[in-house]
Amino acid sequence: MTNIRKTHPLLKILNSSFVDLPAPSNLSSWWNFGSLLGVCLAVQILTGLFLAMHYTADTATAFNSVAHICRDVNYGWLLRYLHANGASMFFICLYLHVGRGLYYGSYTYTETWNVGILLLFTVMATAFMGYVLPWGQMSFWGATVITNLLSAIPYIGTELVQWIWGGFSVDKATLTRFFTFHFLFPFIVAALVIVHLLFLHETGSNNPTGIPSDPDMIPFHPYYTIKDILGFLIMLTALSTLVLFSPDLLGDPDNYTPANPLNTPPHIKPEWYFLFAYAILRSIPNKLGGVLALVLSILILAIVPILHTSKQRSMMFRPLSQCLFWLLVAVLLTLTWIGGQPVEHPYVIIGQTASVLYFMILLILMPLISIMENKLLKW
C-alpha cells in the first residue's frame, strides 16, 4: 500500500516540499537560515498574537498597556521580550541569509531572489511599524522622522505624509493604522514565503560550489531535517539567553519614557538592524538624495543578478571576489556603527566614505573583479 503522505492531497504537497525533496548532498550550515527564518516568523506571529490581546492602540493608553503586559499579564514580560528580541534574531538571520545568497551566487535564481527582496522590504516595514507601537519617545520620534522622509517626494510629498499620518502630525490615527498594518503584514510575509519556496522548488537549491548538483542529490528528510533542528536549538538557545539575561541590550533606553511631542531626544535613531541604511540616508546632505540612497541601499540587490559577470556562480573558488565580499561586510558593520553615532566630525566623513564604498563595491568593483578573474582562468 502506498504511503498516505504520497497520496493525500494536502500531505503530498508537504511531502514534496519537506520530506522527499531532493537536496544537494553538500549544503553547509549557511543553508540553515531559511528554515531559521521560518521559525522566527512563527515565533513572531505567535507572541504578537498574544500581545495584541492585551495591547491598546491608543495614544493615551498604549505605553501603559505595554507596562501592564510586563507587570500584570501571566508571562507577559516573556512574550514582550521574546517579540522584541525575536525581531533582532529575525534580522540577524535575514542578513546572513542574504549574505549567503550573495556569496554563493544564489541570486541567479532571479524569481526566488526578487521575491526575497520583496520579503525583505515587507519585513522591514513590519518591524518599523512595530517599533512605533510601545509609544515611547523613540517610537514617536522615529515614526515622525522616518514618515517625514516621504515629504521629499516632489509635488505629492506633503499630502502623502499627511495621508499616512491621518492628520497634521503623528497621533492617535497614526498609531491605530500602524497597529492594523503591523498585525496584517506578517500574514502577507507568510504568503510571500510560500511563493519564495514555490520558486525555489522549481529550480532546486544551489550549493556551495555553484555547480549543478543533479547527479548527487539526497532526500531532505532525515538529512536536512535533523540539521535544521540543530539550527533551531542553537538559535532558540541564543534567543532565550538574550531574553532572560539582558532583554534590553538591543533596545533604546529612551523608549522607556512615554512619547512627548514637546521634547525631542538628543539622538533620534531606529533599531540597530536599520542603522546601516540610516547611516546611508544621513550621509547625503540633501533630503531627496538621502531618501533615494536609503531605498537604493536595499533595492540594489535587485540588479546584482544583472551585474554578475563571472563565469563561475559561487565565490568559493574566487579569492579576489571573496576579499571584496568581506570588505562589503566590514563596510556594512561600519555603517551600522556610524548610524548610532551623533552627526559630528569624524562620524560624518566616515559614514560618507562607507556609503560611497558600499555602492562602489556592488556596482563597480564586483563586476570588474569578476571580469579579471575570468581572464585569470585563461592563464
UniProtKB/Swiss-Prot annotation:
Binding site for heme b b562: 83, 182
Molecular function (Gene Ontology), one example: ubiquinol-cytochrome-c reductase activity
UniProt cofactor note: Binds 2 heme b groups non-covalently.
Domain of life: Eukaryota
SUPFAM superfamilies, alphabetized: a domain/subunit of cytochrome bc1 complex (Ubiquinol-cytochrome c reductase) (SSF81648), Transmembrane di-heme cytochromes (SSF81342)
InterPro entries in UniProt: Cyt_b/b6_C, Cyt_b/b6_C_sf, Cyt_b/b6_N, Cytb/b6-like_sf, Cytochrome_b, Cytochrome_b_C_euk/bac, Cytochrome_b_N_euk/bac, Di-haem_cyt_TM
Subcellular location: Mitochondrion inner membrane
Membrane topology designation: Multi-pass membrane protein
Cofactor names: heme b
Keyword Ribosomal protein: no
Keywords assigned: Electron transport, Heme, Iron, Membrane, Metal-binding, Mitochondrion, Mitochondrion inner membrane, Respiratory chain, Transmembrane, Transmembrane helix, Transport, Ubiquinone
Protein name: Cytochrome b
Underlying gene: MT-CYB
